[in-house]
A protein has these predicted regions:
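N-terminal targeting leaders characterized by basic, low-complexity, disordered sequences
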Residues: 1-60
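Structural boundary/hinge residues at secondary-structure and domain interfaces
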Residues: 62-216, 261-310, 326-435, 446-488, ...
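Hydrophobic, ordered structural segments
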Residues: 122, 226-255, 318-348, 373
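Short, hydrophobic/aromatic-rich segments at coil-to-beta transitions
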Residues: 167, 210-218, 314, 497-506
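Broad, structure-driven detector of short, well-ordered beta-strand segments within folded domains
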Residues: 168-172, 223-228, 302, 306-322, ...
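Helix N-cap motif at beta-to-alpha junctions
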Residues: 190-195, 236-240, 442-446, 529-532
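A conserved glycine-rich beta-strand in the N-terminal activation segment of trypsin-fold
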Residues: 218-290, 507-580
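Ordered core of a single globular domain
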Residues: 436-440
Length: 605
């Protein structure tokens, strides 16, 4: 409006001026003036737009806030309803699709370990498992059901299927009054408790009685069965089941509510074939002696206990994948004992570059970064911050160093600096026999070669390798006595050139056996086979090695990207008589401040 008013005012003044100069009609004068004025205004507008395009100005906006009480209340109501829906959905999922863990009913201060097996034959984890093992009838669904029939004494379809739920297993606990006693509890989810009770009562070998508000089915043979929520509990003695029922009525913390179990459970997949939990703080000698692998070994369990206590707890899950099995574990360390230690967490990124010197048909490979840090980590865990333990361990290492390499070689000054970078151990096949190779990436090639030569020379000079010989002595009365003595083996140092690389051998006695080493690029290779060293030199040249093999691509690469160290074992070749359907295992470990995460892939033959 302001712009139009100004134009009209100017027009009136110009009309008066024009009328004075010439006697044109007032309407014509007005028409011409307005036409000219609008042209001028349009030109000015165009100029302003051009100027504005060169110097754009930011427009200021005033945001007017308005609050609508009804909308706010409605939004809050939606948020509340959504929270309720999510919570209800989670609880429904927990109840309907995922069985409650037995950990909820176990005392945290007495439970040593438990293992849970998925017993839902319609679950995709079990269907995948049976598909992977279809060539092994002894691991079929039918065989598993036959095993259940044998253990539970009943027909699967008629007696067990009508009540058996999705979870079953065994628990190991310390005795309530005597920690040296080992209590064993079997459990199975009863998806239909009425059918489960009918199954027990039909046996007519159990008498029903009351204890602590629970029904107990007791047999004359000492066996006892009780129900805790949806679980059937079975023990071979009355006191064990009574102790567990007493715990249900107490205010004591369960394993499920403990921090260590939560740390492990949160790192485990929801769907799995089986799950193992171990609380190392509660491990007893009685439990260790129950482990088949340790049962027949001459082990001083008292000396083993301090190391076990540092480990805190471990969880391990078996998962069936489309083409293999996976074992995922989370080993938690005792935070109070390792919180000040700086070597627990691995900082270096491991690439497994040493695999280019290893045969593509290797029987086994284990590699990582910074073995110096590994040793220090192990010492820190054992010592729990006690300097005296560290000093004693250093003395032990130095004593062994002096035994084989003499007093001139100092473990911390000469050997430890060689162990800072990448390392690997490999087992290869040579003429049907296994040979061993150890690899070290050198930091300072010139300096490190001198140290290796010093160690080799001292080993050749000192010996440290003995053989047993029988020496006869004639006594004064003419009696001949025999004595077994340890005689040092003669060690001969020899060198040979192969493709421009010097291979040094330390041959023991008159035989060809011994130790051989060479430096390829910046990698030191030590082996018990001369031909093994030559083979590693050839592998680097012809590019036919583990690094570029299908084995590396399919089995090692998947675990390498998230691992501080890796391992690979060809069980079919390494242990051909092993009665397992697994042909190869590849795995990796990832170190954190409070624990170690491991993933291992099990490949079916």
């Amino acid at each position: 409006m302001g712009k139009k008013a100004n134009i009209k005012k100017i027009v009136r003044e110009l009309i008066k001026e024009k009328e004075g100069k010439d006697k044109k009609d007032k309407r014509k004068i007005k028409k011409e003036l307005i036409k000219g004025m609008w042209r001028e205004e349009q030109v000015k507008e165009k100029d302003k737009k051009k100027e504005a395009s060169h110097h754009p100005k930011k427009e200021k906006f005033k945001i007017k806030l308005s609050f609508n009480g009804k909308k706010i209340f409605g939004g809050a109501l939606v948020a509340i309803m959504l929270s309720i829906l999510i919570t209800t959905g989670y609880l429904l999922f927990e109840k309907v699709f995922k069985p409650i863990s037995i950990a909820k009913y176990l005392p945290s201060d007495r439970t040593i370990a438990f293992v849970e097996f998925n017993s839902n034959f319609n679950h995709n984890q079990l269907t995948k498992s049976f598909e992977l093992l279809q060539d092994y009838p002894e691991y079929s669904e039918k065989k598993v059901q036959e095993l259940l029939e044998q253990k539970l004494v009943g027909n699967y379809d008629a007696d067990l299927k009508v009540w058996l739920g999705r979870n079953m297993g065994v628990v190991f606990m310390k005795g309530k009054s005597d920690g040296k006693i080992l209590e064993k509890i079997y459990f199975a989810e009863a998806i239909n408790k009425s059918n489960a009770k009918r199954f027990i009562e039909n046996k007519k070998t159990y008498a029903k009685m009351e204890y602590a508000g629970y029904e107990i089915y007791a047999a004359e043979t000492g066996e006892n069965i009780a129900f805790i929520d949806s679980y059937l509990i079975y023990t071979k003695d009355k006191k064990t089941i009574e102790n567990l029922l007493d715990f249900q009525n107490s205010e004591n913390k369960s394993v499920f509510l403990s921090e260590k179990y939560s740390r492990i459970s949160n790192n485990m997949p929801i769907n799995k074939v089986a799950f193992l939990y171990v609380n190392f703080n509660e491990v007893s000698e009685a439990f260790l002696k129950k482990i088949p692998l340790l049962r027949n070994m001459d082990i001083n369990f008292q000396q083993l206990m301090p190391l076990i206590k540092v480990l805190d707890s471990d969880g391990m899950a078996l998962i069936a994948m489309n083409d293999k099995f996976a074992v995922q574990s989370f080993l938690t360390l005792n935070v109070d004992k390792v919180k000040e230690e700086k070597y627990i967490n691995m900082k270096e990124k491991y690439s497994a570059s040493i695999t280019q010197y290893v045969s593509e048909n290797a029987l086994a490979f284990y590699g990582g970064q910074n073995i110096e840090g590994q040793i220090k980590r192990f010492i820190e865990i054992l010592s729990s911050g006690k300097q005296s333990v560290v000093e004693n361990f250093d003395k032990i290492l130095q004593n062994y160093t002096q035994k084989y390499f003499g007093s001139e070689v100092i473990f911390n000054l000469d050997i430890m600096p060689l162990l800072k970078n990448e390392y690997a151990l490999a087992i290869e096949n040579e003429g049907g026999k296994p040979i061993y190779k150890f690899f070290l990436e050198l930091s300072d090639k010139k300096k490190d070669i001198q140290i290796l030569e010093k160690i080799a020379n001292n080993f050749a000079k000192i010996g440290g390798v003995y053989k047993q010989e029988v020496i006869e002595h004639t006594l004064p009365d003419g009696t001949v006595s025999k004595e077994i003595v340890a005689v040092p083996e003669a060690i001969k140092k020899e060198s040979e050139d192969y493709k421009g690389i010097k291979i040094t051998g330390l041959k023991i006695g008159g035989e060809s056996k011994g130790f051989f080493y060479a430096i390829i690029d910046n990698i030191a290779i030590i082996s018990d086979s001369f031909n093994g060293i030559k083979n590693s030199i050839d592998l680097k040249e012809n590019k036919s090695n583990l690094k570029v093999s299908d084995t590396f691509l399919k089995l090692i690469t998947p675990v390498l990207k998230n691992s501080d160290e890796i391992s690979y074992f060809n069980l079919a070749k390494l242990l051909p008589n092993l009665p397992l359907p697994i042909s190869e295992i590849s795995g990796g470990n990832n170190y954190f401040d409070d624990g170690i995460v491991s993933i291992n892939y099990l490949h079916v033959k």
